[in-house]
Amino acid sequence: MSEETQYEYLVPLEKYLSAGVRLGTRLSNKYLEERGFIYAVRPDGLRIFDIKKIDERLRIAAKFISRYQPDRILVHTTRPYGFKPVQMFCKFVGCRALTGRFIPGTLTNPYLPNYTEIDLLFVVDPKLDAQAVAEAAKMGIPIIALVDTDTPHQYIDFMIPCNNKGRRSLALIFWILARQVLRERGELKPDQDLPVPPEEFETRLIQ
């Protein structure tokens, strides 16, 4: 039996595949390549992530997040497909959600009405969420980020390699993380799932 067969994923491998979690872009970050996150390159140039490494990083990220007070964690995204996953994650985990525009000074200017003091920042895309990343770095706040194959890694303390652009991918990633954080905190049993399926974390398409 191969090591790949023996490894027990957080969700069935087919779920990762059908959600497109491992699909990257045609651009590649050498930093990610050197760390073995990028598994292969398709004939059309699309980079493919190593699903096992995604799974391993999700486990570690959940342990890391579970050590913080929920209300001292800010999860931010400016990507519309990330709005619902982030809001659902924060609903279950108890942390703060900031979707849409990040007002400059939110983490650095105490005179702003929306000034927020946090101990951990979690962003969906460091490229799009660059303002939040820059402010957290300036304040010495640890940063967790979902990173695609073309994502800059500067200032990121912990990276979760994955497709951070797809609607279904983001839903599954945040569903897994929410479940794992609650398991780590003892609020769910080790084999217990969330009361809603990953589809409930998906941003709905307007017909």
From Swiss-Prot:
Q: Does the keyword Cytoplasm apply?
A: no
Q: Which GO terms describe its cellular component?
A: small ribosomal subunit
UniProt-recorded Gene Ontology molecular function terms = structural constituent of ribosome
Keyword set includes Ribonucleoprotein: yes
Q: Which UniProt keywords apply?
A: Ribonucleoprotein, Ribosomal protein
Biological-process GO terms, alphabetical? translation
Q: Which Pfam families is this protein grouped with?
A: Ribosomal_S2 (PF00318)
Family as reported in the entry's similarity comment: Belongs to the universal ribosomal protein uS2 family.
Which NCBIfam families does the UniProt entry name for this protein? uS2_euk_arch
Q: What is this protein called?
A: Small ribosomal subunit protein uS2
Q: Identify the species of origin.
A: Pyrobaculum islandicum (strain DSM 4184 / JCM 9189 / GEO3)
